[in-house]
């Protein structure tokens, strides 16, 4: 019973809640999101809302589509390869190095933000995405601040670390750990 779409959605929803300044972002977990988004034997819903954060799905046909979505969604997106089938939390894109970054909930890859080249899917094969539709107009997180004042003025996202699970079929036990700096 793989729940990679659910784990990835919970990660992206938490990031959105933090960017929006929601004090209760810690309530957004794989288990809590699953209570409204997961259908046993079917998978994740196309559209769902938990604790003020709404996710919806769409289809993509290219890596360029993913770049555009990441520009519009600083919290990141869920990228799904229906042929694999597997999903990752696609967090950002570095144009200078032409590198995408993600958090992959699979046991072999369960780490904090890593290059997509370390994920078990290829972005060229991603055909479905989920992204946050509410709250909207989120500001991009500060990855590194030049001054203390810059850091205080900008929202920031803590590093996301995922605890390994025992198998790809048992992803429902993935835990999300966040550390605030």
Each PLM stretch: what is its role?
Residues 145-181:
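RTX-like calcium-binding, glycine/aspartate-rich low-complexity repeat tracts
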């Amino acid at each position: 019973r793989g729940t990679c779409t659910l784990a990835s959605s919970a990660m992206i929803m938490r990031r959105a809640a933090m960017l929006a300044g929601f004090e209760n972002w810690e309530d957004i977990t794989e288990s809590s999101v699953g209570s409204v988004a997961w259908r046993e034997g079917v998978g994740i819903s196309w559209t769902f809302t938990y604790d003020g954060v709404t996710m919806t799905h769409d289809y993509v046909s290219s890596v360029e589509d993913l770049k555009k979505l990441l520009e519009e969604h600083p919290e990141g997106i869920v990228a799904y390869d229906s042929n694999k089938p597997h999903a990752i939390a696609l967090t950002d894109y570095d144009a200078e190095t032409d590198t995408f970054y993600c958090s992959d909930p699979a046991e072999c890859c369960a780490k904090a933000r890593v290059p997509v080249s370390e994920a078990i899917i290829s972005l060229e094969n991603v055909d479905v995405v989920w992204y946050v539709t509410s709250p909207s107009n989120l500001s991009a997180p500060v990855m590194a601040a030049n001054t203390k004042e810059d850091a205080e003025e900008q929202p920031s996202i803590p590093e996301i670390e995922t605890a390994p699970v025992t198998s790809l079929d048992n992803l429902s036990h993935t835990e999300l750990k966040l550390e605030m700096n």
